[in-house]
A protein has these predicted regions:
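Acidic, glycine-rich catalytic/binding loops that coordinate metals and/or anionic ligands
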Residues: 1-16, 45, 49-50, 56, ...
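Zn2+-dependent peptidoglycan hydrolase active-site motif and core
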Residues: 50-52, 56-103, 120-135
Length: 217
């Protein structure tokens, strides 16, 4: 996505987008260092690396946690359910790490496309240095805490973590290094018009089916 970009489906709900203009993946799922479903991305633009690369709100969201033992993590939760890349329709939560000068504070609200941070090298004191990058982890639902990764302590990811490519579409992101994952573009499948529940539910199974299809779009 690019700065200021918004993508709203015909039902009025936002489409979740990958937060950088260029994708250059440096560590994928179940990497050798610490990850299960989180990924690392370095900044990239016009054929060269970008340090302190900007990234944007993938959907309208609120910062619900800020802090983090030198990692400078920031956790955001979507304001409403959003259309997800696997066809789902859900509230999403995500965490970003390593911004040396984070701009988001707990309680701050951002509209889809707003600047929310930059890639960086922030790490706890006494630990090995890292290269400039964005650490990104996405989860279903609201913030539900942390769960240990398969690497064990001190490595954790968001509880209810998902594949990033199942949550975020890559519309208007240039895929430089994408790891071969199943990234998807939202091509405008139109959600059905929401069904108005009648006063007398003569055919409740019909209403249920329509709601399910609406959620899946």
């Amino acid at each position: 996505m690019y700065a200021g970009q918004r993508l709203i489906a015909s039902d009025g709900y936002e489409v979740a987008l990958f937060p950088m203009a260029d994708m250059y993946l440096t560590q994928g799922e179940y990497g050798s260092v610490s990850h299960d479903l989180a990924m690392d991305f370095q900044g990239w633009s016009n054929g060269q690396r970008v340090y302190q690369c900007p990234y944007y709100a993938p959907f309208s969201c609120t910062c619900v946690r800020a802090g983090g033992s030198g990692e400078n993590y920031r956790i955001f939760t979507s304001d409403t359910p959003v259309h997800c890349a696997d066809g789902g329709f859900s509230v999403l939560t995500f965490v970003v790490m390593h911004d040396n000068n984070p701009i988001a504070n707990e309680g701050d609200h951002f509209t889809q496309g707003d600047l929310i941070g930059h890639s960086g090298t922030a790490r706890p004191s006494g630990t090995d240095p890292i290269g400039d990058h964005l650490h990104l982890n996405v989860a279903w639902g609201g913030y539900a805490g942390w769960s240990p990764t398969t690497h064990g302590a001190p490595y954790y990811e968001l509880t209810n973590s998902i594949h990033i490519y199942d949550g975020l579409f890559v519309n208007d992101t240039i895929l430089v290094v994408d790891g071969g994952y199943n990234w998807r573009i939202y091509d405008g499948p139109t959600p059905p018009t929401p069904v108005t529940t009648p006063k007398k539910k003569k055919f409740p199974w019909f209403i249920y089916n329509q709601r399910r299809l609406y959620r899946k779009y």
